[in-house]
């Protein structure tokens, strides 16, 4: 860092409008030579009102500013302290523009010589972080941030994180630092000066033994696992006792029973289904069972989970904690497909790419740092999004491996036989080939959250042809000699002529003409599909916000598909006998397109279940054609059931109507399953009430205004009495947004933050919801499971409608042919499972107390009400009007105190 002084600034303001809002708090942390040397903090008085949202966000109320100075009273002192410093902030444009305007209003011209944005720094230094919000960065790197959105604490936290980043940069190999310096010249801010100083002052020394070099890339040396040796002669019971004692957990007989049951099924190569209710401690139970099985037999166990979050928890938290508690060395490894792992040849190609783009430049710098620290090369560690992900995917698709490439998948394969536990997810479990050498090493598998397997299987058997994807794939090739792969081919042909390369001539003009025709044929194909949509019955699938056509003639589509496949075959003939790597990249892309169209053609000819989906009825570009290639039951049977000698399905919601039959029939083979139920009967369930309003009109599809108004009335009643947060679950985006609009217009919610589910933003929204004391979260099916919200007061989950899939839902259409009675055998069990998962959002531990409100009267007034009532056996149930609801809330609130 040298001896320069950095002024790390954070401002709190009345809003984000530069011309209308004021600063209400300023915090500055001064850093020199990787140390905090001074701080400055002041509240700033304003004549503007502080909006309720800002008060909730910052905990700054208007009375806190009454004795504070106006900015013009402290401006000169702040300027004097900052004028010679490097200006630093997180999302620097916001803070810099606000403080420059505030200075200008005081007749002070502030122009810092150098500006650094820590958002830019942290993206580069911490490439695997899931979020670059300050509070989440602080938590990820062990920095205490008690009061986020307070300027003094935010500035200090930003400074501490910046110091961590700079310390990390200084420890990098010199070759990596030099590359970062050259790339940093294309950043928005002045980070290149920092890298220049680091390179200039670098203490030259040989490359550390922990690194290796591939071309210009320095990467972390891969260290193979040693074959584990676990010296233990005791029983599972004593192993369990030691684990819970060392981990500070409560000894639970039901948890031990679950572990013993799993071990017994593994030892006897059985197929089993286990419903283990909330609080049974599934993860610890099956980890101990898998470990004990390995100790006794030497065999390793595959564990498949539903989410990345649970995978990370097992690998980064639970297994390391067990290692420490038991004084063992459990080798565990994340198992995925080859395409999920990086190759150094691909990184080298990306670094050499001359694409001039800010996000691509950041990605190159992230890759340089990531490859010095990743032990696995798992691409998902990078959490790529948006333009970076599109660019990276493009590079993967067109990459032809180098001769001496280093691929991290080979490391995974090499070490798989030296592990005790393999961790995978349902998608990879179902997608993996039987011939896959890694999966062949496992005879035994535990499938956690097994109730989600059918959804992943349906994704696996459904083939998709989308306009956007095909246009993107064609775009990677280009339409003329100045674009993408066609440009590379054109340059190759010129090189062949000038340098007399030993390859056959390439018909550039013929290739251009062929590509233009392929583009035209693709447009014709989707125009045909667009015409079919306009001439057909269209059904809305509101939960996914698409319009679907289920019944249509395929004759014209097949004609267009045949034409485009024929043209792709003729285009591929241009490259017969040419093996240059540039040609291989283009051939790879053309073959991908041909296979995509050919698979759809074959499925349509065979009469497989298909449907057309369109997001915007007026835009051809939003069309997708789906074809179901195989039965879900066939895939689950072949890819899961037949792959392992012993197989244990475990979930909190496997049973339906007191039976495992609904889950059993997802397999088309008459296999015997042992079935078990582990019920902990949490006391907290008895502390939770299910309230069913009697004054809400039955849901009417064509007129839901009254139904929505009733939901809002109950939300008002709840928030008025409790001042607590609330989760409201919907089965329709339309209803969710209607409720959102009403809440935003009502004065009762001025001091509440109303959050709504958004695409690809669930993690961020959950974090915001958990951070606010007064918040309402409106969500759809995504939030029926896998989401635990935190609340100090009463917890409340409101369920707008029972989570039945609509008969115009794509899943319903695709699964219909696999059941005799689709509603009874598939739709109803699915709805009950989702409802049980929704109840589980509230009950997470013994201390939870709260209320579940179900507005759907089908819960008590339908032919299947008894099945839903089974899910409520452990809850106190009450039916009544809104006054009785308020009375119940006051009773719960009194008990909570």
From Swiss-Prot:
Pfam families reported in the protein's UniProt record: Helicase_C_2, RNase_T
SMART domains registered for this protein in UniProt: EXOIII, HELICc2
EC number in record: 3.1.-.-
InterPro entries the UniProt entry points to: ATP-dep_Helicase_C (IPR006555), DinG (IPR006310), DnaQ (IPR006054), Exonuclease_RNaseT/DNA_pol3 (IPR013520), Helic_SF1/SF2_ATP-bd_DinG/Rad3 (IPR014013), P-loop_NTPase (IPR027417), RNaseH-like_sf (IPR012337), RNaseH_sf (IPR036397)
Enzyme class: hydrolase
Cross-referenced SUPFAM superfamilies: P-loop containing nucleoside triphosphate hydrolases (SSF52540), Ribonuclease H-like (SSF53098)
Protein name listed in UniProt: 3'-5' exonuclease DinG
Highest taxon of the lineage: Bacteria
GO cellular component: cytosol
Gene Ontology molecular function: 3'-5' exonuclease activity; ATP binding; DNA binding; DNA-directed DNA polymerase activity; helicase activity; hydrolase activity, acting on acid anhydrides, in phosphorus-containing anhydrides
Domain Helicase ATP-binding per the UniProt entry, residue ranges: 241-496
Keyword field contains Ubl conjugation: no
Residues the entry annotates as binding ATP: 276-283
Signal peptide (residue range): none
The species this protein was found in: Staphylococcus aureus (strain bovine RF122 / ET3-1)
Domain annotation Exonuclease: ranges: 8-161
């Amino acid at each position: 860092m040298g001896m320069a002084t950095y002024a790390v600034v954070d401002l709190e303001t009345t809003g984000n409008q530069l011309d209308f809002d004021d600063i209400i708090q300023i915090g500055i942390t001064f850093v020199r030579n990787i140390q905090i040397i001074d701080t400055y903090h002041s509240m700033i008085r304003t004549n503007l009102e502080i909006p309720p949202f800002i008060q909730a966000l910052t905990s700054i109320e208007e009375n806190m500013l009454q004795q504070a100075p106006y900015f013009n009273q402290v401006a000169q002192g702040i300027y004097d302290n900052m004028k010679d410093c490097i200006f630093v902030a997180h999302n620097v444009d916001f803070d810099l523009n606000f403080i420059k305007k505030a200075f200008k209003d005081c007749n002070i011209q502030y122009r810092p010589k150098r500006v650094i944005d820590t958002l830019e720094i942290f993206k580069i230094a911490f490439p695997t972080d899931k979020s670059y919000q300050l509070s989440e960065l602080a938590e990820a790197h062990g920095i205490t941030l008690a009061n986020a959105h307070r300027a003094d604490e935010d500035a200090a936290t930003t400074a501490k994180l910046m110091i961590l980043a700079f310390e990390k940069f200084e420890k990098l190999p010199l070759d990596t630092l030099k590359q970062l310096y050259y790339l940093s010249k294309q950043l928005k801010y002045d980070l290149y000066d920092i890298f220049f100083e680091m390179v200039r002052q670098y203490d030259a020394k040989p490359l550390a033994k922990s690194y290796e070099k591939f071309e210009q890339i320095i990467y972390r040396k891969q260290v193979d696992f040693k074959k584990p040796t676990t010296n233990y002669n005791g029983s599972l019971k004593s192993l369990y006792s030691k684990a819970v004692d060392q981990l500070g957990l409560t000894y639970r007989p039901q948890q031990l029973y679950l572990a013993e049951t799993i071990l017994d099924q593994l030892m006897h190569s059985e197929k089993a289904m286990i419903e283990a209710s909330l609080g049974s401690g599934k993860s610890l139970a099956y980890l101990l069972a898998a470990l004990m099985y390995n100790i006794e037999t030497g065999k390793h166990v595959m564990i498949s989970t539903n989410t990345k979050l649970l995978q990370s928890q097992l690998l980064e938290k639970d297994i390391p904690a067990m290692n420490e508690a038991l004084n063992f060395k459990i080798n565990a490894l994340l198992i995925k497909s080859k395409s999920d792992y990086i190759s150094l040849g691909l990184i080298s190609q990306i670094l050499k790419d001359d694409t001039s783009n800010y996000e691509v430049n950041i990605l190159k710098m992230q890759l340089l740092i990531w490859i010095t620290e990743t032990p696995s090369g798992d691409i998902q560690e990078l959490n790529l999004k948006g333009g970076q992900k599109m660019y990276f995917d493009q590079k993967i698709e067109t990459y032809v491996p180098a001769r001496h490439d280093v691929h991290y998948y080979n490391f995974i394969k090499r070490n798989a036989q030296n592990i005790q536990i393999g961790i995978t997810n349902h998608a990879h479990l179902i997608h993996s080939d039987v011939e896959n050498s890694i999966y062949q090493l496992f005879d035994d598998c535990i499938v956690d959250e097994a109730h989600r397997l059918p959804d992943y299987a349906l994704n696996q058997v459904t083939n998709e042809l989308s306009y956007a994807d095909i246009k993107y794939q064609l775009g990677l090739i280009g339409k003329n000699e100045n674009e993408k792969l066609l440009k590379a081919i054109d340059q190759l042909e010129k090189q062949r002529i000038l340098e007399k390369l030993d390859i056959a001539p390439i018909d550039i003009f013929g290739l251009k003409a062929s590509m233009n025709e392929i583009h035209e044929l693709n447009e014709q194909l989707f125009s045909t599909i667009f015409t079919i949509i306009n001439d057909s019955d269209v059904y809305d699938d509101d939960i996914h916000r698409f319009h679907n056509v289920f019944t249509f003639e395929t004759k014209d589509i097949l004609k267009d598909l045949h034409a485009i496949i024929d043209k792709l075959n003729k285009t591929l003939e241009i490259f017969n006998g040419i093996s240059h790597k540039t040609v291989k990249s283009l051939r790879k892309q053309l073959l991908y397109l041909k296979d995509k169209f050919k698979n759809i053609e074959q499925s349509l000819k065979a009469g497989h279940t298909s449907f057309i989906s369109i997001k915007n009825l007026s835009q051809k570009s939003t069309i997708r054609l789906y074809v179901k290639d195989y039965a879900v039951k066939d895939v689950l049977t072949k890819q899961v059931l037949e792959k392992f000698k012993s197989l244990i399905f475990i979930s909190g919601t496997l049973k339906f109507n007191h039976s495992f039959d609904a889950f059993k029939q997802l397999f088309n083979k008459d296999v015997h399953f042992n079935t078990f139920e582990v019920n902990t009967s949490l006391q907290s369930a008895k502390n939770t009430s299910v309230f069913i309003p009697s004054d809400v009109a039955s849901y009417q599809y064509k007129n839901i205004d009254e139904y929505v108004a009733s939901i809002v009335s109950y939300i008002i009643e709840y928030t008025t009495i409790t001042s607590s947060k609330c989760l409201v679950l919907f089965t329709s985006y339309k209803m969710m947004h209607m409720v959102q609009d009403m809440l935003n217009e009502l004065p009762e919610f001025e001091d509440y933050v109303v959050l709504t589910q958004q695409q690809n933003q669930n993690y961020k929204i959950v974090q915001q919801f958990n951070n606010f004391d007064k918040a309402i979260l409106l969500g759809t099916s995504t939030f029926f499971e896998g989401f635990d919200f935190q609340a100090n007061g009463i917890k409340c989950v409101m369920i707008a409608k029972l989570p039945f899939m609509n008969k115009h839902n794509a899943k319903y259409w695709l699964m219909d042919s696999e059941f005799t009675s689709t509603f009874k055998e598939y739709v109803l069990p699915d709805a009950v499972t989702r409802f049980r998962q929704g109840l589980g959002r509230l009950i997470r531990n013994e201390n939870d107390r709260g209320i579940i409100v179900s507005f759907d009267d089908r819960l008590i007034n339908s032919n299947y009400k008894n099945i839903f009532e089974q899910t409520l056996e452990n809850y106190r149930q009450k039916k009544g009007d809104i006054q009785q609801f308020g009375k119940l809330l006051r009773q719960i609130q009194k008990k909570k105190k």
